[in-house]
Amino acid sequence: MPVVTLPDGSQRQFDHAVSVMDVACDIGPGLAKACIAGRVNGELVDACELIDSDANLAIITSKDDAGLEIIRHSCAHLLGHAIKQLWPDTKMAIGPIIDNGFYYDVDLGRALTQEDIELLEKRMLELAKKDYDVIKKKVNWQEARDTFVARGEDYKVQILDENISRDDRPGLYNHEEYIDMCRGPHVPNMRFCHHFKLQKVAGAYWRGDSNNKMLQRIYGTAWADKKQLNTYLQRLEEAAKRDHRKIGKQLDLYHMQEEAPGMAFWHNDGWTIFRELETFVRTKLKEYQYQEVKGPFMMDRVMWERTGHWENYGEHMFTTSSENREYCVKPMNCPGHIQIFNQGLKSYRDLPLRMAEFGSCHRNEPSGALHGLMRVRGFTQDDAHIFCTEEQIHREVSSCIKMVYDVYSTFGFEKIVVKLSTRPEKRIGTEEQWNQAEESLAAALQENGVQFEYQPGEGAFYGPKIEFTLHDCLDRAWQCGTVQLDFSLPGRLSASYVGENNERKVPVMIHRAVLGSLERFIGILTEEYAGFFPTWIAPQQVVVMNITDSQADYVQELVKKLQDAGIRAKADLRNEKIGFKIREHTLRRVPYMLVCGEKEVESGKVSVRTRRGKDLGSIDVNGFIEKLLIEIRSRNLHQLEE
């Protein structure tokens, strides 16, 4: 006689085993209709799962995050159902959920076209609208294998042979004549899977191994209702308009080419943004009392073996050799900073020592994972390492947190999700060290009024960490900032200082990054602002245009005056209509366009327009420069008169 306890504390008693769906029906028809799955004693299960002993139960609906994930997973099965109807010889591989959707890897024997994708989506919708029940069967390993051997599903057979124990009872989900294998849970009926969209097809190696066959990965998105789907598709459309690769080309910021995959060729305007970003960060380094250093581009492989990087990260490192020595191009800056720390005797009075670098790093990322500036092989880290005592951890972490929020607020990022990752099962250091470290990080966050969530067991083996994930205007998440404690690396590389009692002690090292990678952060900013960079960081801040040749000298004089004031300005003296010039520079997102005609020459003023189309009228030149300099120096996000 199971007693089922619901989330509100109420209980229902049954005189026999009941399914999750039975309990939902007992509560009411509305909940039964909405029931997708259940959470029994904390574990997600199918709606058909039997409860035969006392249990805690939460009914999962499409309003729950878990419910939406289940809908997406079932849409992957729906895709499999449709593709096997259209192309029966297709071999199905894996079909997991991902952020906002799902994919399925398939072996079709030919490349899918856009027409194929449209046909596939149409068939999926036809099947979903039949509102058929999804039937789950738990079978023994041999029956599952026989099922997929008979169906010619080689990849499913391989999964069974290599990844599933002979003692397991795999779950087979029956979608009419189509059968798929999955841990589940899945929707009980396809009425939950009406709102989806297939998005794209890409290549993917079986099991992610380039030695295996290349499969086709079909991506899709799925939502609980039509409104959610349309909202997401509109967001995707807006994201496509803001794509930093597209805008980077339009604004002539940078380019990539095959001869240097994952490494940017910065053009003048893009490099201007890069240098402005560096200058801004340098002001913060000075404000927060950091030294700026520069380590070597590469070091002997022996160094990376000592740090443990070669063993754990070697496949992602570029190497070269000279005079029978093997060198590794650095993927990160920390070992170099410890070498600088080790030069000369250090006392506890020298700590904390804050060391920052705009380090040029390289990582051998897979070519298929490269994506504009967001995923590169060559990048610049705004990296810093703080060497301190255990007693100084709290204060230093608190300072790092302040710096992170200080920087992000300058760019207008307000939604920042913070996570504190705590000790993993396998770790170094004493329990006392971990207790103090975790308490110091949590206290520093609380001291700064930062809301955060714990990620138990997700810290590195050498120390806990804080992750800062900023959300952009489209609510996309970008993990940028980190504050990571390290009890291991300083000791591995023989870093030490003399304590108060003249004993040798190993410093704690705090790894700290704010922007992460400058390249990636510029990509994020490009998409956040859609290329409308705040004036202080805009590559061209002002363009001055003449209407006829008679204003050319006045324009040149004005440009020189602007440049002498430290404003990035240029002249446009082309023999084109003024409307054409304005349209062109508007498309180039130049913050201010100054128009000079006879009236302006006579009055010594300028006619000012913004890139958003606002006409600020005729303004005194000196007054305009004064206001513009205030906007630039304050790093204001808004333009004059906005």
Curated annotation (Swiss-Prot):
<dbReference type="Pfam" id="PF02824">
    <property type="entry name" value="TGS"/>
</dbReference>
<dbReference type="GO" id="GO:0005829">
    <property type="term" value="C:cytosol"/>
</dbReference>
<dbReference type="GO" id="GO:0006435">
    <property type="term" value="P:threonyl-tRNA aminoacylation"/>
</dbReference>
<dbReference type="InterPro" id="IPR004154">
    <property type="entry name" value="Anticodon-bd"/>
</dbReference>
<keyword id="KW-0648">Protein biosynthesis</keyword>
<dbReference type="InterPro" id="IPR006195">
    <property type="entry name" value="aa-tRNA-synth_II"/>
</dbReference>
<dbReference type="InterPro" id="IPR004095">
    <property type="entry name" value="TGS"/>
</dbReference>
<dbReference type="InterPro" id="IPR045864">
    <property type="entry name" value="aa-tRNA-synth_II/BPL/LPL"/>
</dbReference>
<keyword id="KW-0694">RNA-binding</keyword>
<keyword id="KW-0436">Ligase</keyword>
<feature type="domain" description="TGS">
    <location>
        <begin position="1"/>
        <end position="61"/>
    </location>
</feature>
<dbReference type="InterPro" id="IPR002320">
    <property type="entry name" value="Thr-tRNA-ligase_IIa"/>
</dbReference>
<feature type="binding site">
    <location>
        <position position="385"/>
    </location>
    <ligand>
        <name>Zn(2+)</name>
    </ligand>
</feature>
<comment type="similarity">
    <text>Belongs to the class-II aminoacyl-tRNA synthetase family.</text>
</comment>
<dbReference type="InterPro" id="IPR002314">
    <property type="entry name" value="aa-tRNA-synt_IIb"/>
</dbReference>
<dbReference type="GO" id="GO:0000049">
    <property type="term" value="F:tRNA binding"/>
</dbReference>
<dbReference type="InterPro" id="IPR033728">
    <property type="entry name" value="ThrRS_core"/>
</dbReference>
<keyword id="KW-0963">Cytoplasm</keyword>
<dbReference type="InterPro" id="IPR036621">
    <property type="entry name" value="Anticodon-bd_dom_sf"/>
</dbReference>
<keyword id="KW-0820">tRNA-binding</keyword>
<dbReference type="InterPro" id="IPR012675">
    <property type="entry name" value="Beta-grasp_dom_sf"/>
</dbReference>
<feature type="binding site">
    <location>
        <position position="511"/>
    </location>
    <ligand>
        <name>Zn(2+)</name>
    </ligand>
</feature>
<protein>
    <recommendedName>
        <fullName>Threonine--tRNA ligase</fullName>
        <ecNumber>6.1.1.3</ecNumber>
    </recommendedName>
</protein>
<comment type="subunit">
    <text>Homodimer.</text>
</comment>
<comment type="function">
    <text>Catalyzes the attachment of threonine to tRNA(Thr) in a two-step reaction: L-threonine is first activated by ATP to form Thr-AMP and then transferred to the acceptor end of tRNA(Thr). Also edits incorrectly charged L-seryl-tRNA(Thr).</text>
</comment>
<dbReference type="Pfam" id="PF07973">
    <property type="entry name" value="tRNA_SAD"/>
</dbReference>
<dbReference type="InterPro" id="IPR018163">
    <property type="entry name" value="Thr/Ala-tRNA-synth_IIc_edit"/>
</dbReference>
<keyword id="KW-0862">Zinc</keyword>
<dbReference type="GO" id="GO:0005524">
    <property type="term" value="F:ATP binding"/>
</dbReference>
<dbReference type="InterPro" id="IPR012947">
    <property type="entry name" value="tRNA_SAD"/>
</dbReference>
<keyword id="KW-0067">ATP-binding</keyword>
<keyword id="KW-0547">Nucleotide-binding</keyword>
<keyword id="KW-0030">Aminoacyl-tRNA synthetase</keyword>
<feature type="binding site">
    <location>
        <position position="334"/>
    </location>
    <ligand>
        <name>Zn(2+)</name>
    </ligand>
</feature>
<keyword id="KW-0479">Metal-binding</keyword>
<dbReference type="GO" id="GO:0046872">
    <property type="term" value="F:metal ion binding"/>
</dbReference>
<dbReference type="InterPro" id="IPR047246">
    <property type="entry name" value="ThrRS_anticodon"/>
</dbReference>
<feature type="region of interest" description="Catalytic">
    <location>
        <begin position="243"/>
        <end position="534"/>
    </location>
</feature>
<dbReference type="InterPro" id="IPR012676">
    <property type="entry name" value="TGS-like"/>
</dbReference>
<dbReference type="Pfam" id="PF00587">
    <property type="entry name" value="tRNA-synt_2b"/>
</dbReference>
<dbReference type="GO" id="GO:0004829">
    <property type="term" value="F:threonine-tRNA ligase activity"/>
</dbReference>
<dbReference type="Pfam" id="PF03129">
    <property type="entry name" value="HGTP_anticodon"/>
</dbReference>
